[in-house]
Structure formats: C-alpha cells, structure tokens
Amino acid sequence: MAVNLTRRQALAAGAAGLTAAVAGGAGLVQAGVLPGRYRVGRLLGACDVGDPPPTTVAPGPLRFASFASKARGRPVAYGVAWPPGSGPGDRLPVCLLLHAAAGNERTPFERLRLHHHLAQAAGPGRVRPLALAWADGDGSGWRPAPGDDPFAMLLDELLPLLSGLGLRTSPGQVGVLGWSMGGAGALRLAERSPDRLAAVVATSPAVAASGPEVAGTGRLRALPVKIDCGANDPFADATRALAAALPTAEVAVAKGCHDGVFWQRQAPAQLRFLAAALGP
C-alpha cells in the first residue's frame, strides 16, 4: 500500500536518517572500522583531560650546554634540571629524558615544563629529590645506526658528564622517561641495557603491537616499568600489547590523546614513580 508523506514528515524523516547515519559513521570510526578515529575522537572530547596540573613552586637551577659526541659523530646539546634547593655538586639520582620526534633537548623544559613539575613533586615531605637530564636526539629516532648510536651517547658520554656535576649515575640511580618516539626509545634503551638502569617510564610509546619493543619486554621483567597512554592515541592498542607482554609493569590507558596536555597530566605520578625506584 502506498504511503503519502507530507513535506514536513519527509524532511523530519530525512533529518532523523542523517543523524543516525552520522552517529553510525562516528561509531564505526571510533571502532576503527573507518579511518579518522583520532580526529573524530578529538572532536568528540576524547582529549579533554583538563588543564595540566598546577605548579606553584619555583623551579630549581637549569643548565644547558653541549659536548662533542663520538658515539653520534656530532655535537650534542643537553640540559640538566635540579630541584629547588639543589644544584651542581649535589649527590642526586638522575632521570634521562627522551624527547618526541619533533622535539629537542629543550622540549621537556619549554613545552612540557618538567622542571616545574619536578619542583612541585620534590617539595618538603613529598618525593625523594632527583635531577632530570636530557639530550638532543637530533633525528635519530632513538634508534642506534652505524656511526650514530644515541644510546651509547646517553650511557657512555652523557652520564659521565652528569657524574662530573655531582649526580649519582651508578646503575641503581639512573632512570629513563620518554614520550612518543622517546617513549619507544626508553623501552629500547632499557631492553638493550637493563643492567644500567633502575626504572623506565614510557609515555604514549610509538611502537607497534607486533614490534621488537613488545617482543623484547622479557628483558624488562626485573625493572620497575610504568607505561601511560591515552585511549584516543594511535598507540593505545600497542600499549595494551605491552601490558599483556609485561604483566609486572604498571600500565594505564586512560582518557586522553597523543599530545602535550596528556603528557603533562601524567608527569606528577611518573616523577613519584621514578623517585621511589631510584636509589637514595
């Protein structure tokens, strides 16, 4: 039997159908069936994790310098941050920071404000003081290559420089923290030299679920490991694969995206984790 619709009814039915199609399409995108999942997630508020944690404590000293790296065959810029009330000559454990792909030795300081989060975390009665040190990966991808070994640069060249500044660089007193490409690099460094590190933290690590970083997690079982990733991050599934491969690790996939806001939100808990793991 034919059904005659008024113009208003036809328009209403069309609008309802369009709404259902859009909602269904968004659902398919979020489920990974259609491309654009992360862009749609951002539009839907998946990145809205609030402002970065407030920092009310003035940071401690910062130092930037460079050295000629034989391991990399080039000059390498680096930086060091001490907590408030400390400075060169103080015997503190140290955490190496590995920047993301678009970063350099100043990114943890200028973009992520890690020296402010360090000052906030290391206040009286809070966590054990530690220093932060970082170097410019300069397009290495934090992957060793013939004639360019960023890991040898960190362990065999930067650490002795830090020791000369009074920092404690024995294996039980050095940690590593990285973001994105640097998060993957932190895992690779720890898998390559687990005896040189006391803890590893990877934020939004840029790895594949079937990649060597996941396959190599057996070498990390004796280390304290913390991994954080946003649920709307392209590497969330790989982070879940890391969690399955390394059940001893502290792994969290929470609301957030692959961005600096999410990374800063993780900083206080990550610094507490590192301070607890590094030796006195």
Segments predicted by a language model, with ranges:
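Non-catalytic cap/lid and distal C-terminal segments of serine-dependent acyl enzymes
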Residues: A2-L5, Q9-P280
